[in-house]
Regions:
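C-terminal segments of enzyme domains that contribute to small-molecule binding surfaces
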Residues: 162-230
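C-terminal end-of-chain micro-motif
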Residues: 93, 230-231
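Tandem repeat scaffolds
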Residues: 2-190
Length: 231
């Protein structure tokens, strides 16, 4: 079944009712766009806190300066959205797709973004402070000035430079842990690279992951053993 398609006029009316509901739930109605086709709609500056966009198709929507705090975007398609200065604080957006989105100076503080995708998105100066980014994908994303302080970045995929972004000490230790585990746990890298990685083992073994998986392991050709630092 195809997603319900809304006209801009219908969207405007639903947003107006939702904004009234935020002020007094007796007179308005909460917006429910779950599963809707909202491609290219204009929601700039609207207050849509706690609205439901679960599994909605919002490709190419205009969301600049809108407030989506505590909204539900689980499984939603937000590719190519224009959402600079938008607020997604404390929203649920697990498995959502923000590929190639323009999110400069957007806010995702405290948001749940597990397995969300930000491939080729512009996320410079975005705040992911205290967000859950477990297994999120930032491959080829444009970062810089991005705030990841106290965010859960376990198994996050990066392949571009992270210079200028904000990571706290615990997160740096986690990044070191996953790097050391990947390099030393296999035989695909050169001895030079393996020896270089050993120099940050003490940092890696301070990661929270050690409590769950143990210290960094290395493969010695026969079995995995606890990795040793370069003497």
């Amino acid at each position: 079944m195809e997603n319900k398609v809304y006209t801009q006029e219908e969207v405007n009316e639903i947003c107006t009712q939702h904004e009234a509901w935020l002020k007094d739930w007796h007179i308005g109605k909460r917006a429910d766009f779950s599963g809707a086709n909202l491609r290219g709609v204009h929601l700039e500056g609207r207050s849509l806190r706690e609205a439901n966009f679960q599994s909605a198709d919002m490709k190419g929507a205009f969301l600049k300066s809108a407030d989506f705090s505590h909204a539900n975007f689980e499984g939603a398609n937000l590719t190519f959205v224009r959402a600079s200065y938008a607020k997604f604080n404390d929203c649920i957006a697990d498995h959502a797709c923000f590929d190639k989105a323009h999110l400069t100076v957007a806010y995702f503080e405290g948001a749940s973004l597990q397995r969300a995708s930000f491939r080729e998105a512009q996320v410079n100066f975005v705040s992911f402070r205290e967000a859950n980014l477990w297994r999120a994908d930032f491959i080829d994303a444009v970062t810089g000035g991005t705030n990841f302080v106290r965010a859960d970045i376990d198994y996050v995929a990066f392949n571009t430079g992270n210079a200028g972004n904000c990571f706290d000490d615990k997160q740096v230790a986690e990044l070191a842990y996953h790097l050391c585990s990947a390099v030393l746990g296999s035989r695909t890298n050169s001895p030079e690279v393996r020896d270089t990685v050993r120099k940050i083992l003490s940092l890696a073994n301070r990661a929270e992951s050690v409590k769950v998986f143990g210290k960094v392991q290395e493969f010695n050709g026969v079995k995995h053993v606890t990795a040793k630092e370069t003497e």
